[in-house]
Structure formats: structure tokens, C-alpha cells
């Protein structure tokens, strides 16, 4: 039975999709219409009790949360495609460290920018300019740390592309695109080089080409 990914067109599920494509794993996608509330229906809540995307079904096995799905796929299919977890326990420690940084430090201010610049009007709440300013300042500070780190390391976890890098792709793509703050990446030499590298990977290009919302 082919692995199924629910909600492919949204940003967080793309973490799972790019990992699956990198590893060469066959899968199918099932759309979830958040605007119609499909994510709050009993059938979907049976897969993801918190009502967010993605949810993944792999035979009889169910898993949700995009970074957990990334880890699951990279571990289960470790023998095929690029090793996204590292070759040593020390490598793995760095991958996990930067995955945590992405989830707890990088993502929160970027999510605020995403919601209040891209989706406030669609979701029916007023855009909070004060929060936008504070979030941009917070993200700038985080990116300054990335700049220093990436001046000494090609990728976040070392000299190899890992889940830590891939986890940044979906929302950073928003940052340099529809959010309109590409300068936050481009003005930092080493962050910019890293972004150009990871966003040029064929797996990410395929993810964007196949699973973005129609214009």
C-alpha cells in the first residue's frame, strides 16, 4: 500500500513531501480543504487529532507532525537516497539540534509573519503591524546567528544536506516570495549561499512545481 500524505498544498506538509522525494519513496497525496473545515471533520481527526496538516498513513501506521514525518521517512528509508541523518551519532546530534532550532527559534517569528502578512485577510483577522515588526526583528537576530554558523559550515549540521536544512524550505520560501522580505536572506552572504543551494535541489523544485496552490 502506497504511503499517503494529507494536505500537500500547505507549507508544513511540504517538509514531508521534500523528504519523500529526496529519498525516492512512492507516495500519493490527498487534499484537505482547510477553508471548508475538512481538517475538523471526524474522518480527518481520526488521523490527526489536533486538526492540522499533514497527516501521513503508511499501511496500518499513522503519523502526524511534519518534522516527525521527516524523521520517520529518513530512518525507514535510510538505505536509499541521500543520508539525511548523518553517518555518526555526532552528526545525528547536530541534525537534531538544528531541527529543534528550526522548530523553536526560527519558525515562530516566521510563522507570525506568514499569518499576518499573507493570510490575515483570508482568515478574517486584522493584521498586527506591531507583531510584524517584532517578529521581523526577532527573525533577524536568529538569522544573524545562522550567518555566523554558516560561515564555518556549508550546511546546518555539517558538510552534508540533512533534515535540518530541508525543514527550513517551505516557510523560507514564503519569506523570500509572497511575504516580500527576501532581503533578510540575501543581505547575509552565507545564509544566502546556503538558501540558494538548498532551494535549488531537484527534490524541492519538484515539490514546489507539483504541490503549490494554483496561481
Curated annotation (Swiss-Prot):
Residue numbers binding glutathione: 11-12, 39-40, 52-53, 65-66
Protein localization: Cytoplasm, Cytosol
Gene3D superfamilies assigned to the protein according to its UniProt record, in alphabetical order: 1.20.1050.10, Glutaredoxin
Regulation: Redox-regulated enzyme; in oxidative stress conditions methionine oxidation ensure a thermodynamic and structural compensatory mechanism to guarantee H(2)O(2) peroxidase activity despite transferase activity inhibition.
Alphabetical keyword list: Cytoplasm, Detoxification, Oxidation, Oxidoreductase, Peroxidase, Phosphoprotein, Stress response, Transferase
Principal localisation: cytoplasm
Modified residues (Phosphoserine): 12
Methionine sulfoxide: residues carrying this PTM: 35, 118, 123, 184
Reported induction: By zinc in roots and benoxacor.
Catalytic activity: RX + glutathione = an S-substituted glutathione + a halide anion + H(+)
Domain GST N-terminal: 2-81
One cellular-component annotation, GO: chloroplast
EC number(s) from the headed UniProt entry: 2.5.1.18
SUPFAM superfamilies (alphabetical): GST C-terminal domain-like (SSF47616), Thioredoxin-like (SSF52833)
Family: Belongs to the GST superfamily. Phi family.
Protein name: Glutathione S-transferase F9
Name of encoding gene: GSTF9
Amino acid at each position: 500500500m502506497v504511503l499517503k500524505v494529507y494536505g500537500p498544498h500547505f507549507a508544513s506538509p511540504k517538509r514531508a513531501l521534500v523528504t519523500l522525494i529526496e529519498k525516492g519513496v512512492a507516495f500519493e497525496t490527498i487534499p484537505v480543504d482547510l477553508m471548508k473545515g475538512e481538517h475538523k471533520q471526524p474522518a480527518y481527526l481520526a488521523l490527526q487529532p489536533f486538526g492540522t496538516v499533514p497527516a501521513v498513513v503508511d499501511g496500518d501506521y499513522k503519523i502526524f507532525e511534519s518534522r516527525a514525518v521527516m524523521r520517520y521517512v529518513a530512518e525507514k528509508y535510510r538505505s536509499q537516497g541521500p543520508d539525511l541523518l548523518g553517518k555518526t551519532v555526532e552528526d545525528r546530534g547536530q541534525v537534531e539540534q538544528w531541527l529543534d532550532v528550526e522548530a523553536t527559534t526560527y519558525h515562530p517569528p516566521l510563522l507570525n509573519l506568514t499569518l499576518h502578512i499573507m493570510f490575515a485577510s483570508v482568515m478574517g483577522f486584522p493584521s498586527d503591524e506591531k507583531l510584524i515588526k517584532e517578529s521581523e526583528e526577532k527573525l533577524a537576530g536568529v538569522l544573524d546567528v545562522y550567518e555566523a554558523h554558516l560561515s564555518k559550515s556549508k550546511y546546518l549540521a555539517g558538510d552534508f544536506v540533512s533534515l535540518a536544512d530541508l525543514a527550513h524550505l517551505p516557510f523560507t520560501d514564503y519569506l523570500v516570495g509572497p511575504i516580500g522580505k527576501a532581503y533578510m536572506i540575501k543581505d547575509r552572504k552565507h545564509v544566502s549561499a546556503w538558501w540558494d543551494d538548498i532551494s535549488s535541489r531537484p527534490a524541492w523544485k519538484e515539490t514546489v512545481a507539483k504541490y503549490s496552490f494554483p496561481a
